[in-house]
Amino acid sequence: MRHGWQMCALLIDFFGSSGKVEAQKMLERRAFENKRLLGTFNVDVDNWLDFFTYTDFVDRDGKFQLQMLKYSSFAPLGRSTSYMLREEAFHMGTGNDGLRRVVEAGVIPQWLLQKYLNKWISSSFDLFGTDHSSSAHWAYVWGIKGRYDEPQNEKTVELDDLNDYNRHLYRQEVSGLVERLNSFQRPGEKKLYTPDIKFNRSIGRWSGQRFHSETGEALDERAYQEHVAECLPSAADKAVLLDIIKNEKKWIKEKEGARDPFSTIGEPRRSAINL
């Protein structure tokens, strides 16, 4: 919501009457009945494991997009991203800390946690957009948006491969996070993995194609359907998860240093909206 307000402020302050019209359209738009423009945001988040994996990995895509806009030659846009990046950092920290505590508790089985990683990480790959995108090409040429690693990257830019380039940087970062989660597993547990970048894709060159989630090898239709049933959460898996959360009090490790929220209920609070 706050991101939208900031973009509306830019439209109103710098784009005259047409900017005000576009800002009004943005503020009036509603995304009921799963009509959000990006498919990932139409997927239900209705349990704690969904919430933690979503905020760790989907909001991480938001960090990547905002960081690319931070290098914008349109200074007001570049400056505005700092506040939004701060907000995304809170989201990612919440998700990553939650997943770590789930892994440390060791109650939710590895195979079930892996299914939710496969679900949300593969969906996040799509958020980087189509391959060979003309929009990404011209956004770079016109200085609206840079590469994620722009200040450190001295290589000649591949203008027709920008989205996929940033998508691979995202996967590298996510792979490091998954490896870190593995360091909190109990001895003997099967390691978690980052899904292959071709798996379960709805956008780009791999859209609608059939690949193994871990190895990336091509599969025929029958083998793929069997594999999807094994590596993405089903209604039965969700029922298992909800039963664990309901009946296992220690399904997540207690947060270290956590305070009872009611103990500070009378204290003045700083709203993130005012940062």
Task: Identify what each model region corresponds to.
Residues 1-29, 96-99:
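Conserved alpha-helical segments that form or flank metal/cofactor-binding pockets of metalloenzymes
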Residues 10, 35-42, 67-68, 98, ...:
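Domain-scale activation on soluble regions of proteins
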Residues 27-55, 105-106, 120-139:
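Acidic/His metal-coordination segments adjacent to aromatic residues that form catalytic metal sites
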Residues 43-94:
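Internal, conserved structured core segments that host functional sites
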Residues 68-69, 75-79, 89-105, 153-163, ...:
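Polyanion-binding and phosphate-handling cores
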Residues 76, 80-138:
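A contiguous pocket-lining binding segment that forms or flanks enzyme active sites
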Residues 111-275:
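Extended, helix-rich structural scaffolds rather than catalytic motifs
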